[in-house]
Amino acid sequence: MALAAAPASAENDRRGYASLRYDEDWRALCDPARRTQPFDAVKCRDTGGGTTLTLGGELRERFEAVRNPVFGLAARGSDRVLLHRLLVHADWRAGDAVRVFVQLADRRATTRGFGNPPTDRDAVDLAQGFLDLGVGGLTLRAGRQELDLGSGRLVAVRDGANIRRAFDGGRASWRRHGWRIDALFLQPVAIAPAAFDDGTDTSQALWGGYATTPPLAGVGQIDFYYLGLRRNRGVFAAGTARELRHSFGARWFGKRDGVDWDIEAVVQAGRFGADRIAAWTLASNLGWRVAAPLRLGLKADIASGDARPGDGRLGTFNALYPKLPYFTEANLVAPANLMDLQPGVTVTPAPRLELAASIDLLWKHRRADAFYAPPLTPIAATRGGGRWIGWQASLSANWRVTPRLTLRGAYVRFAPGAAIRAAGGRAGDFVMTSVAIKF
């Protein structure tokens, strides 16, 4: 299929586990001569007539503990939860012309004292299920599917939550000569807790096009895109109304001589009820690899807020369906009416071990607008007043013990600034550990 190219060797296959499991191609292991590990014969089976069936899955166990989530504005006190997620999938292909991908999921959680969000629990259900038809570099996909676009600032799978984000709909993808172009019309999956009862959220829709250039002679690559969003019920500090939003964006990213960069700009127009939308964001992630194991980084973001509520124009940026958590594992803030500066350092003392530390300084972009909690919830008591939201300091470790086994941990300490203290905000902590096994 045009959406995934077969790796050159079985060993490369084993290093090629991907966040989007449909991006993997294990057909090399259908050749008995390339099977070198005990379960290789199970991983890929020749089903005759030029067709193959590959199997895979992931088991993740994650523990979280939090004190005063979202600066104590969501709840006060301490809470903890154990999250269990099991994913299994089958990938049947008839060469590169026809493909059927099916992924089932079981997501469970212990009971939180503050109440479990909808993204915690779902009995066995269809996580993904789609049909691909491929001709040359063009692939047409229809069905339920996960999606990551570019940096994930606007559309991503939301892997931190127990239930990853998926969409129902169609996508056309073209890959040729280093170009990647996608056109899509999708609606988010509506999560329901019982078995096989997840439907389509018809109150929302996402459509548009996304293109990525080939590498450009030492200056990186460029994404450019248009994304449309409809929400029958959009909620902002300015009120609740039908939202029709158009996002026009560009992203420049790459690395050279120890320097890496990822810079993205988006402008938004549309309608929010009777009001017109005029919003924007500018985001950057810059890094300098001082020595082989050490990277110094700086993230800086501005997501516009609403300067004058009631003036007939909504200025609050909407990040659509972004990666969450967005800044740290504590999932403290949504990228709306926000200015953020996050210096950090990353150390890789061993090839598969990454240690990181950062501090994130947060301000409201517009005083008159609210502070927005994830995913995009305005906290009414934070309208007006000061800009200083507060800070969060993060320590994290990511150890890929083997290509199949990954251990992760994070600690975040956060404290409110004047704008949040005035609304009753408090300091808090977040701790997370997880183990994930892919197969």
Description of each model-found segment:
Residues 72-76, 117-122, 158-162, 198-202, ...:
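Flexible, surface-exposed loop regions and adjacent strand-edge segments
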Residues 54-64, 101-105, 141-145, 182-186, ...:
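Transmembrane beta-strands of outer-membrane beta-barrel proteins
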Residues 12-34, 237-238, 264-268, 275-383:
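Extracellular/periplasmic loop regions
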Residues 136-140, 153-310, 348, 368, ...:
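Signature for the C-terminal beta-barrel architecture of outer-membrane proteins
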Residues 65-84, 94-138, 149-157, 194, ...:
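Surface-exposed loop and membrane-interface regions of Gram-negative outer-membrane beta-barrel proteins
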